[in-house]
Amino acid sequence: TKPR
């Protein structure tokens, strides 16, 4: 997933 994408970094926050």
UniProtKB/Swiss-Prot annotation:
Domain of life, source organism: Eukaryota
Note from the entry: An IgG (called leucokinin) binds reversibly to the cell membrane of neutrophils in the blood. Leucokininase on the membrane releases the active peptide tuftsin from the gamma chain. Tuftsin is essential for maximum stimulation of the phagocytic activity of neutrophils.
Name this protein carries in UniProt: Phagocytosis-stimulating peptide
Species in which this protein is naturally found: Homo sapiens (Human)
